[in-house]
C-alpha cells in the first residue's frame, strides 16, 4: 500500500448507535483498504435522505454513516497503481494527492468502519471522480450519490443506451414545484409539470402525445407512482423508482416496474433488513464502471450541474442535527454541506 504520510491509528466517525440515532466516536478505527481501493481524507460531506432513513429503518449498530464525500487521496490499495483500467477508458488514473469525490455505502454491516461521515473513507479506485479545476470541495460533495444513481437508473434499469457522446439527446419532461421550474428548464428539461396538480399525469401524457415510454420516480410513494403510471403512454413502458415501490401502485400490466438501490453498484451483497437485503449484482458494477467514464467527461465539460447547497458550520459534530432536519422534511431544494477538514493534507498534487 502506498500512503501520503503516516496514517493515524484512529479517526472521528459518525456511528450508528440505535434506530435513528448517531453519535461521533472520536477513536474509531480507520476503514480497511482493499487492494482496489483508494483511501480519501474527507474534506466535505453532504447529507442525503438515505442517510437518516437507513439509520431509522435498518440501523447497523457500530457502523459508520454517510454517503456523499469529497476529499484528497492519501493512500492507494496494493493493486491500484498496476490497474490500467482508468487509462484504457480515457480516465485519469487516481494517485495520491488527487482531489476526488464520490458516494459510498454507509451503514454497511459487512464493512462497518467505512462511511462518508468520517475523517477517512475507502472507495474503489474505479468508482471515484476527479474534481475538475474551479470546483470546490463543498460543491463536489453534493454530487456523488446523485450521479451514480442517475447512471444506474437510466442506463441499466430503464435500459436507455449509454451515450457515446457528451449528451444522450433524449427529450426530458419533469415534475417539480413552481419555485424550481426556472432551474429545471435552465438545466435542459423540455417542460415541467406541477406534481401537486391533480391532472399532472394526464397533462404529461397529453404533452408527450401518449408516447412516453420511460419514467424515473425520484419520490417513490403511492402518489408519485400514480403520476408516472398515468403519464406513461398507452403502449406501456418502463418505470424505475429510487426506493422499493408500493406494490399496490402497480396498476398497469403494460408497465414494467423496477427499483434501484445504488449501493449495488459496488458489486457486493447488501445486508439491510428486507426488502433491502440484496445479493451481489455484478451487472450493476459493470454498468457503474462504464457510466463513471461517461460521467467524468460530462463533469469535466461542465455539463453536470450540482444541486443547490447550504454550507453549515460545526463540522462532523453538527451532521446529526442536519440529518434530523432532512428526515423531518425541513430541507427542500438544497443539500446541506459540512466541512470535515479545514485544510488539505500535505503534498497535494496540482
Curated annotation (Swiss-Prot):
GO molecular function, one term: oxidoreductase activity, acting on NAD(P)H
Catalysed conversion reaction: N-[(4E,6E,10S,12Z,14E)-6,10-dimethyl-3-oxohexadeca-4,6,12,14-tetraenoyl]-L-tyrosyl-[ACP] = (3E,5S)-3-[(2E,4E,8S,10E,12Z)-1-hydroxy-4,8-dimethyltetradeca-2,4,10,12-tetraen-1-ylidene]-5-[(4-hydroxyphenyl)methyl]pyrrolidine-2,4-dione + holo-[ACP] + H(+)
EC id: 1.-.-.-
Keywords annotated in UniProt: NADP, Nucleotide-binding, Oxidoreductase
Residues reported in the UniProt entry to bind NADP(+): 50-53, 177-180, 195, 242-243, 331-332
Pathway it works in: Mycotoxin biosynthesis
InterPro entries listed in its UniProt record: ADH-like_N, GroES-like_sf, NAD(P)-bd_dom_sf, PKS_ER, Trans-enoyl_RdTase-like
One Pfam match: ADH_N
Domain of life: Eukaryota
Binding residue positions for substrate: 145-152, 262-266
Function, in words: Trans-enoyl reductase; part of the gene cluster that mediates the biosynthesis of ilicicolin H, a 4-hydroxy-2-pyridonealkaloid that has potent and broad antifungal activities by inhibiting the mitochondrial respiration chain. IliB collaborates with the hybrid PKS-NRPS synthetase iliA to assemble the backbone of ilicicolin H. The PKS portion of iliA and trans-acting enoyl reductase iliB work together to construct an octaketide, and two methyl groups are introduced by the MT domain of iliA during the chain assembly.
Subunit record text: Monomer.
PANTHER family for this protein: HYPOTHETICAL OXIDOREDUCTASE (EUROFUNG) (PTHR45348), TRANS-ENOYL REDUCTASE APDC (PTHR45348:SF6)
Family designation: Belongs to the zinc-containing alcohol dehydrogenase family.
Protein name listed in UniProt: Trans-enoyl reductase iliB
Originating organism: Hypocrea jecorina (strain QM6a)
Phylogenetic lineage: Eukaryota, Fungi, Dikarya, Ascomycota, Pezizomycotina
